[in-house]
Amino acid sequence: MYLKHNLLTLTDKESFIHGEKVNVAVVYADLRGFAQWSLTSTPSQITRVIEVVYDRVIQLAFFYKHTFHKFLGDGFVLIWEEKDHGTLADALHWALAAAFEIHKRYWYIAERLQFPSPLGFGIGIACGEVVRIDPETFIPELNDPDFVGYPMNCGARLQKLAGPYGTVLDSRGVDIAMKNPERVLRTTNEILRLELFKPHNKAISMAHTFTGLQEDDIFGFCYVTWPYVKNSLWNVDGRV
């Protein structure tokens, strides 16, 4: 919250913070090279790119059924709760579909911008149990829900291993995808099917340096590609 132009409302209500364990698929998306790019860009160019970020989240809210989102400057986090979709495989289905929609739409938009733009989104996806925090404090403006837990940290860290137009999936997500290939990886659709790729040693070495990343995710994460769109639109798969 930007406090300079906002007032906080004080009430006589007692503060209470409720927590509930929920299973989620979480997507972290971040524009690669944004910080360096912004050093030589005009404010209007920067705001145009940030507008693209906001537009993507608004679009995803309508068509990809996420439960929660939060803007993070030149990126954002999206969360699908299992209970909203029936199974974690279904939540992951929507998370992966949204990830590649983000890549596809940014590619089209970047091609049409009248100035050089950041390289593309890097995306990290993690699955598992988190705690949803629902605060009810005596300051209503602060009562926004939030999520905490290992999958949140894992997704944020794995996102750093994704290059432009790259998508990284944690070990739990990989296990879910391999057990539900038709739903998660869309294997029966030649155009929409996704593929998992094991990371090479350089990526594993980088993952090993991330504080708090569990061993299963250091060695068990995978890159996800959409072969049809990759071959049609861009020639990178995001692997570092």
Which residues fall in each region the model found?
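Catalytic core of nucleotidyl cyclases, primarily class III adenylyl/guanylyl cyclases
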Residues: 64-91, 108-148
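Acidic, metal/cofactor-coordinating or nucleic-acid-engaging core segments within structured domains
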Residues: 94-100, 105-111, 115, 166-168
